[in-house]
């Protein structure tokens, strides 16, 4: 019996009991990984579709990979939509249309739980301690707006701990970006007036704001308070300048314009944000697994996934019809706990013109993406031929480590896929926190065997994405130059994880190293009984970039012409891993230095160290503090404060 018949029989067996009701079904592969999630108004009718003979290639591949099938009945189509969206978000099935870059947009937040509210950049759910304005399409746009606001209104941006510890104005006051409320340079009433002006500006009430400021300027002038009047005049000028630079719309107040475009089977969905009559930027998305999909399907999947994480405006403007729009609206409203939402496709007028322009920009974004995609695919074909791979690599992992004479050691994995570097898949290994007893070679897969003899790494199945806070917490240092042991530990931990995540197995591993590293990789691969292709890339005898050597099992060492595009590409991969390793090593080292500087002061134990950091808010603030400021911390007397000051200022 063929594979296709077997899979078809599996679906037929499920059809016997499948009800003619709405619900969600899930397909699993041989490893019990969810490979597809779908919804249906009628489960029996929908599953019958998969035993037809005229299926497209993507659906045939999906069915060929299906070993198990489950379905869940829902009370309504809206509930089915919601469940489907939740399962797609949770499992990220490879045959579903996926929105890979789902990070939340940044906001400008005005904290209102303090006598002198703070203005800051913010990501995440809206909290009760302030008011959020936005969203903005990028952190750059938020930072630019914050800088302009600080120049115009001079509200504080510092943390509460820093604010409470000040006895004199900081640099922000000196460069005229803060009124220094921390030391009483402005009273609460005047500061609250500035806060109200910031709210007006961010809510788009700029005309009314400028009128109020003009009246205030005239009042101050009539009272002979010319310096204050001049300051208001400068604020009005600055507001006018910011308005000229910003894209103000008199057509759309609060809306997202979302357009979908297609070229050569690839799709781009671009989102244009409008809030308070102003354009807040745009960002393109390139959904995956869109083969044999329609614009309707891509847009539907995008909307459900996008609005699970992003703030929903009063109106969503799209350029293409979607199926069952009313149920989509109800699903998005339930996800975000809102009562009003409108999804429209404008036919004529100003909104239609905005949509047309948005589609033109989206098509340009897609063309730029395709250029990069095609170039990347060409390089992947060359890599397949160069290293004798059986298929075009879809996922390449590059390994490197960084340390100083064995101290503060970190290992990293950098991942590159079809569309370039996939930074969400980057991983950092805090090698310093692992006991050297891992080199006892007790590998295979049970956690107990993996750490035989180890007393410090109590749970080797912990995620390999080590939190950066953990990177410098240990005392273990490696023997000088012991790169082999570091690589061994990284591979043990990585392959242990990959055993449990077979869908993330790389097509190729590239290790920054030479012949000795090659032996370590082969040894660990054999112990794990895994057969992932790998190659070691070294800088040659004199360690010079440009004469790289490649080491592979069963092959002679070889080099490539430095002018070849594939050579330059491999150097870019190696350099990305190298830079990522150095960045994380320096981060850990700087934390260790900061903590040890306080640890080395006689009379400063763990309790006093915590008290100092809690009072001042950061290590830098402790360093900036005067002796008098240090004495305000509980447990720090005058003589100890002087010792802390002298020690920190010797560095």
UniProtKB/Swiss-Prot annotation:
<keyword id="KW-0228">DNA excision</keyword>
<comment type="subunit">
    <text>Interacts with UvrB in an incision complex.</text>
</comment>
<dbReference type="Pfam" id="PF14520">
    <property type="entry name" value="HHH_5"/>
</dbReference>
<keyword id="KW-0742">SOS response</keyword>
<feature type="domain" description="UVR">
    <location>
        <begin position="207"/>
        <end position="242"/>
    </location>
</feature>
<dbReference type="InterPro" id="IPR000305">
    <property type="entry name" value="GIY-YIG_endonuc"/>
</dbReference>
<dbReference type="Pfam" id="PF01541">
    <property type="entry name" value="GIY-YIG"/>
</dbReference>
<feature type="domain" description="GIY-YIG">
    <location>
        <begin position="20"/>
        <end position="97"/>
    </location>
</feature>
<protein>
    <recommendedName>
        <fullName>UvrABC system protein C</fullName>
    </recommendedName>
</protein>
<keyword id="KW-0963">Cytoplasm</keyword>
<dbReference type="InterPro" id="IPR004791">
    <property type="entry name" value="UvrC"/>
</dbReference>
<keyword id="KW-0227">DNA damage</keyword>
<dbReference type="InterPro" id="IPR038476">
    <property type="entry name" value="UvrC_RNase_H_dom_sf"/>
</dbReference>
<keyword id="KW-0267">Excision nuclease</keyword>
<dbReference type="GO" id="GO:0009380">
    <property type="term" value="C:excinuclease repair complex"/>
</dbReference>
<dbReference type="InterPro" id="IPR001943">
    <property type="entry name" value="UVR_dom"/>
</dbReference>
<dbReference type="InterPro" id="IPR035901">
    <property type="entry name" value="GIY-YIG_endonuc_sf"/>
</dbReference>
<dbReference type="InterPro" id="IPR001162">
    <property type="entry name" value="UvrC_RNase_H_dom"/>
</dbReference>
<dbReference type="GO" id="GO:0006289">
    <property type="term" value="P:nucleotide-excision repair"/>
</dbReference>
<dbReference type="InterPro" id="IPR047296">
    <property type="entry name" value="GIY-YIG_UvrC_Cho"/>
</dbReference>
<comment type="function">
    <text>The UvrABC repair system catalyzes the recognition and processing of DNA lesions. UvrC both incises the 5' and 3' sides of the lesion. The N-terminal half is responsible for the 3' incision and the C-terminal half is responsible for the 5' incision.</text>
</comment>
<comment type="similarity">
    <text>Belongs to the UvrC family.</text>
</comment>
<dbReference type="InterPro" id="IPR010994">
    <property type="entry name" value="RuvA_2-like"/>
</dbReference>
<dbReference type="GO" id="GO:0009432">
    <property type="term" value="P:SOS response"/>
</dbReference>
<dbReference type="GO" id="GO:0005737">
    <property type="term" value="C:cytoplasm"/>
</dbReference>
<dbReference type="Pfam" id="PF02151">
    <property type="entry name" value="UVR"/>
</dbReference>
<dbReference type="Pfam" id="PF22920">
    <property type="entry name" value="UvrC_RNaseH"/>
</dbReference>
<keyword id="KW-0234">DNA repair</keyword>
<dbReference type="Pfam" id="PF08459">
    <property type="entry name" value="UvrC_RNaseH_dom"/>
</dbReference>
<dbReference type="InterPro" id="IPR036876">
    <property type="entry name" value="UVR_dom_sf"/>
</dbReference>
<dbReference type="InterPro" id="IPR050066">
    <property type="entry name" value="UvrABC_protein_C"/>
</dbReference>
<dbReference type="InterPro" id="IPR003583">
    <property type="entry name" value="Hlx-hairpin-Hlx_DNA-bd_motif"/>
</dbReference>
<dbReference type="GO" id="GO:0003677">
    <property type="term" value="F:DNA binding"/>
</dbReference>
<dbReference type="GO" id="GO:0009381">
    <property type="term" value="F:excinuclease ABC activity"/>
</dbReference>
């Amino acid at each position: 019996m063929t594979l296709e018949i077997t899979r078809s029989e599996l679906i037929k067996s499920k059809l016997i009991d499948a009800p003619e009701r709405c619900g969600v079904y899930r397909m699993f592969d041989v490893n019990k990984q969810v490979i597809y999630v779908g919804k249906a108004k009628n489960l029996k009718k929908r599953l019958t579709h998969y035993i037809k003979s005229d299926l497209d290639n993507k659906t045939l591949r999906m069915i060929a990979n299906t070993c198990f099938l489950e379905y869940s009945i829902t009370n309504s189509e809206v509930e089915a939509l919601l469940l489907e969206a939740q399962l797609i978000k949770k499992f990220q099935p490879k045959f579903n249309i996926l929105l890979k870059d789902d990070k939340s947009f940044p906001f400008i937040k005005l904290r209102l739980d303090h006598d002198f509210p703070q203005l800051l950049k913010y990501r995440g759910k809206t909290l009760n301690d302030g008011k959020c304005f936005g969203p903005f399409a990028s952190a750059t746009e938020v930072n630019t707006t914050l800088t302009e606001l600080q120049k115009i209104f001079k509200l504080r941006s510092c943390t509460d701990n820093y604010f409470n510890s000040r006895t004199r104005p900081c640099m922000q006051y000196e460069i005229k970006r803060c009124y220094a409320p921390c030391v009483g340079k402005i009273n609460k009433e005047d500061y609250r007036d500035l806060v109200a002006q910031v709210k007006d500006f961010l809510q788009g009430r700029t005309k009314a704001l400028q009128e109020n400021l003009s009246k205030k300027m005239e009042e101050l002038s009539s009272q002979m308070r010319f310096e204050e009047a001049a300051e208001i005049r400068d604020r009005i000028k600055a507001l006018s300048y910011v308005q000229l630079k910003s894209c103000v719309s008199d057509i759309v107040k609060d809306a997202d314009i979302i357009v979908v475009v297609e070229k050569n089977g690839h799709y781009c969905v671009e989102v244009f944000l409008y809030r308070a009559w102003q354009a807040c930027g745009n960002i393109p998305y390139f959904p995956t697994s869109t083969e044999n999909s329609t614009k309707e399907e891509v847009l539907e999947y995008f909307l459900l996934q996008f609005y699970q994480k992003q703030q929903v405006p009063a109106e969503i403007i799209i350029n293409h019809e979607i199926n069952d729009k009313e149920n989509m609206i109800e699903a998005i409203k339930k996800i975000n706990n809102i009562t009003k939402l409108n999804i429209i496709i404008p036919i004529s007028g100003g909104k239609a013109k905005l949509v047309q322009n948005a589609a033109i920009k989206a098509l340009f974004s897609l063309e730029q993406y395709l250029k990069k995609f095609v170039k990347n695919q060409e390089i992947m074909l060359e890599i397949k031929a160069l290293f004798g791979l059986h298929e075009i690599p879809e996922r390449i992992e590059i390994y490197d480590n960084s340390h100083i004479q064995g101290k503060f050691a970190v290992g990293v994995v950098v991942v590159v896929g079809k569309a370039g570097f996939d930074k969400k898949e980057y991983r950092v290994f805090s090698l310093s926190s692992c006991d050297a007893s891992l080199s006892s070679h007790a590998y295979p897969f049970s956690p107990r065997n993996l750490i035989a003899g180890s007393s410090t790494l109590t749970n080797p199945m912990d995620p390999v994405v080590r939190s950066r806070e953990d990177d410098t917490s240990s005392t273990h240092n490696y023997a000088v130059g012991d790169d082999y042991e570091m690589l061994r530990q990284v591979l043990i931990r990585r392959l242990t994880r990959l055993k449990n995540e077979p869908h993330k197995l790389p097509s190729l591993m590239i290790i920054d190293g030479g012949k000795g590293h090659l032996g370590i990789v082969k040894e660990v691969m054999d112990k794990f009984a895994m057969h992932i292709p790998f190659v070691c890339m070294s800088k040659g005898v004199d360690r010079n970039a440009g004469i790289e050597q490649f080491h592979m099992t069963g092959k002679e060492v070889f080099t490539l012409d430095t002018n070849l595009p594939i050579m330059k590409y491999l150097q870019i991969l190696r350099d990305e891993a190298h830079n990522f390793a150095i960045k994380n090593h320096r981060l850990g080292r700087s934390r260790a230095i900061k903590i040890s500087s306080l640890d080395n002061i006689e009379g400063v134990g763990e309790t006093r160290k915590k008290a100092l950091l809690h009072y001042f808010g950061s290590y830098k603030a402790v360093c900036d503090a005067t002796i008098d400021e240090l004495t305000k911390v509980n447990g720090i007397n005058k003589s100890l404060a002087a010792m802390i000051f002298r020690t920190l200022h010797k560095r």
